[in-house]
UniProtKB/Swiss-Prot annotation:
Its EC number is 2.8.4.4. The gene is rimO. This is Ribosomal protein uS12 methylthiotransferase RimO. Its main location: cytoplasm. Binds 2 [4Fe-4S] clusters. One cluster is coordinated with 3 cysteines and an exchangeable S-adenosyl-L-methionine. SUPFAM superfamilies: Radical SAM enzymes. It comes from Rhodopseudomonas palustris (strain TIE-1). It catalyses: L-aspartate(89)-[ribosomal protein uS12]-hydrogen + (sulfur carrier)-SH + AH2 + 2 S-adenosyl-L-methionine = 3-methylsulfanyl-L-aspartate(89)-[ribosomal protein uS12]-hydrogen + (sulfur carrier)-H + 5'-deoxyadenosine + L-methionine + A + S-adenosyl-L-homocysteine + 2 H(+). The lineage of its organism: Bacteria, Pseudomonadati, Pseudomonadota, Alphaproteobacteria, Hyphomicrobiales. It comes from the Bacteria. Residues 134-371 form the Radical SAM core domain. Transmembrane segments: none annotated.
Length: 441
């Protein structure tokens, strides 16, 4: 006999956009089975916590979230990257109902079913064709693969999520098409290593509409560019074939934006990280990219205070940044990660040195960012609207990804809508953001 009311699930999603997509997939299945989402733990039938386990600080955040769920509800299912090594969770919270690792969707659903059976059997017409999304309606993350074949010395992602497993290109494109049909204006392409897409399946073809499409970075990006939405490429490893997509950007098929986590510039540090070390060639490539696509925006992340990083190495990084002129930069102070080979490296860096170098790096980047944004004053930029304010509206240019990059603050004579793409005249710039007025629709 069916239960009278729909079971309610409270959901916490921590970590990176890849984990957010995992959460969306779990929630889509739960909604298809008649479960409802609760806004608060208190009063929900269950709480699911999708954890992050990449850094110690992320593990502490995950444990705190589990603790809050246990205190306010008591019925907690844990999944995600930290769940791949459950001992710490079990020691802190032995009463959790279930612990699973990342991408183990069926195990999570089984745990939910055991604790609170579904209201009815799943019928996919109970959820929208594009599935349930945790992002605003006008943009969505599109995950094209799982896992990673690289073995960076500071990273345990392959241990947590396994080796590269690429989705068929046809499946990715069908998901993207549904998202665009549902009103998504911006597709953020993500994976652990986006530019390695298809390597594991030898670029196998799969059917898409009336043709076959290869599971290859360039081919997929080109097809996504035909769907009529902004296409933004994230987590791109700097392989030589990345050069090929710059033409798509110059032609306006995908956004002139590349998110490439270089991590450092010193060849010695990069070798210790087990990352590509030819940074002089990288500077040449960046120069060629910008010659081919002058509007190209580069985002990157860097680690300071890596074991063995000398003052000379750090100065090399600062000088490299001056030449590369990275538009958007995220910086992290090195943290040991349990199970990472870098833990065994000699010459660990003191915390106060890490902090001092981080401060200097961010100050240098602030000046670079301000200089590059100032060049946009007087230009016209397309802006996608994210938030409507009483007097000023917040949006993003093609050079800005949501949450991690800068913003464009606009005044407009007529009301604007979230998700609308407008043309803005840029009036002024500060260190990280642009300010302007709407000049066209």
């Amino acid at each position: 006999m069916q239960q009278a009311t729909a079971p309610k699930i409270s959901f916490v999603s921590l970590g990176c956009p890849k984990a957010l997509v995992d959460s969306e997939r779990i929630i889509t299945r739960l909604r298809a089975e008649g479960y409802e989402l609760a806004r608060k733990h208190d009063g929900a039938d269950l709480v699911i916590v999708n954890t992050c386990g990449f850094l110690d600080s992320a593990k502490q955040e995950s444990l705190a979230a589990i603790g809050e769920a246990m205190a306010t509800n008591g019925k907690v299912i844990v999944t995600g990257c930290m769940g791949a090594e459950p001992e710490q969770i079990e020691a802190a919270y032995p009463g959790v109902l279930s612990i699973t690792g990342p991408q183990q969707y069926e195990s999570v659903l089984d745990a939910v079913h055991r604790a609170r059976p579904a209201l009815h059997n799943p019928h996919l017409d109970l959820v929208p064709p594009q599935g349930v999304r945790l992002t605003p309606r006008h943009y969505a993350y599109l995950k094209i693969s799982e896992g990673c074949n690289n073995r960076c010395s500071f990273c345990i992602i392959p241990k947590l999520r396994g080796d590269l497993v690429s989705r068929p290109a046809g499946d990715v494109l069908r998901e993207a098409e549904k998202l665009v049909a549902a009103g998504v204006k911006e597709l953020l392409v993500i994976s652990q290593d986006t530019s390695a897409y298809g390597v594991d399946v030898k670029y196998a073809e799969s059917p898409w509409k009336d043709r076959a499409v290869r599971a290859k970075f360039l081919d997929l990006a080109s097809e996504l560019g035909e769907l009529g939405a902004w296409v933004r490429l994230h987590y791109v490893y700097p392989y030589p074939h990345v050069d090929e997509v710059i033409g798509l950007m110059a032609d306006g098929k995908v956004l002139p934006y590349l998110d490439i986590p270089f991590q450092h510039a010193s060849p010695d540090v990069l070798k210790l990280m087990k990352r590509p070390a030819a940074q002089d060639k990288t500077l040449d490539r960046i120069k060629r990219w910008r010659e081919q696509c002058p509007d190209l925006a580069l985002r990157s992340t860097f680690i300071v205070g890596f074991p063995g990083e000398t003052e000379r190495d750090f100065e090399f990084l600062l000088e490299w940044l001056d030449e590369a002129e990275i538009d958007r930069l995220g910086a992290f102070k090195y943290e040991p990660v349990a199970g990472a080979p870098s833990n065994a490296l000699p010459d660990q860096i003191a915390d106060e040195v890490k902090q001092e170098r981080w401060n200097r790096l961010m100050a240098r980047q602030q000046a670079i960012s301000a200089r590059r944004l100032k060049r946009k004053v007087g230009t016209r930029q397309q802006v996608i609207i994210d938030e409507i304010g009483p007097t000023v509206t917040k949006g993003r240019s093609k050079a800005d990804a949501p949450e991690i990059d800068g913003a464009v603050y606009l005044s407009s004579r007529r009301p604007l809508r979230v998700g609308e793409i407008v043309t803005a005249k840029i009036d002024r710039a500060d260190a990280y953001d642009l300010h302007g007025t709407v000049a066209g629709f």
